[in-house]
Amino acid sequence: MFFFDKHTWRGESGRRYKFKCVLDKNSMPKAGTGGIYIFVRRRWAFFLEPLYVGKAHDIRNRLLGHEKWGRAYWYYGATERYILHPIVDEIDRRRIEEDLIKGLMPPMNDAEMGSSSPEAAARRAAMLKRWFDVRSWRGLLGGVKAQRA
């Protein structure tokens, strides 16, 4: 299905990662496959908000018994799970997870990010400023692309 197929997220480094949507057990990879996963809330049709980023050496078993999925579903309104697999090396999984957490700033990863630091607050403020800048949306809506000063 096109609507629940693949989505690309960008980490703090600017690197893009292409994730696959997982809606049921049958679409999950085989047991023993490592990777990265994201809990997501779908706002409107194509506006996805990442809520939690994690890594696992066995992504199937981790997602089927994840302790934070209930909280993500009931309190944050999570609707989907996206996975990036296979990533065999633990060091690569750790590096990608950290890059995505710093770039996406998901609310359920706040304790792991150290969001109380002034640098994190400044990054979040800059992100919100870009998000609410109407001129940056003109390119998406068919108008002229915004000029940055």
Predicted regions: what they are:
Residues M1-L51, K55-A149:
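Boundary/linker segments flanking structured domains
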